[in-house]
Amino acid sequence: MSQAITGQPVNLTASGAIYGKPAQLIGFYVNSTTAGTIILKDGGSSGTALSGTITPAVGWHFFPADFASSAYATIGGTLNVTFIFQP
């Protein structure tokens, strides 16, 4: 028997908070993009980068990551992305 991995969604089209408290990212779904990029950070816009610059294709991206204080995404280009996380 398999167990589903579930989480809470948050959609972003510009840089912003994924979640303002400690959280675990499961991954993200890119709804649409035109040269879009993502940098994931722990601790807000000036926080510690947990990734390099990601240039994702449309679709699901499994990206497990722990955010000790808060989860933030810096978005460049044109990108519509839904992050799935667990508080």
Residue ranges and their predicted role:
Residues T13-S15, A57-G59, A68-S70, T78:
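Tight coil/turn sites that cap or link beta-strands
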Residues M1-K21, G76-P87:
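C-terminal interaction-tip segments
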Residues G47-A68:
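Glycine-rich strand-loop-strand elements at beta-sheet edges
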Residues T34-L50, T82-Q86:
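Short, surface-exposed beta-strand/strand-loop-strand elements in extracellular ectodomains
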Residues I26-F28, P64-T78:
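Noncatalytic modules at the cell exterior or secretory-pathway interfaces
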Residues S32, D42, I75-G77:
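Residues on the solvent-exposed faces and adjacent turns
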Residues S15-T33:
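Short, surface-exposed binding/anchoring microloops in extracellular/periplasmic proteins
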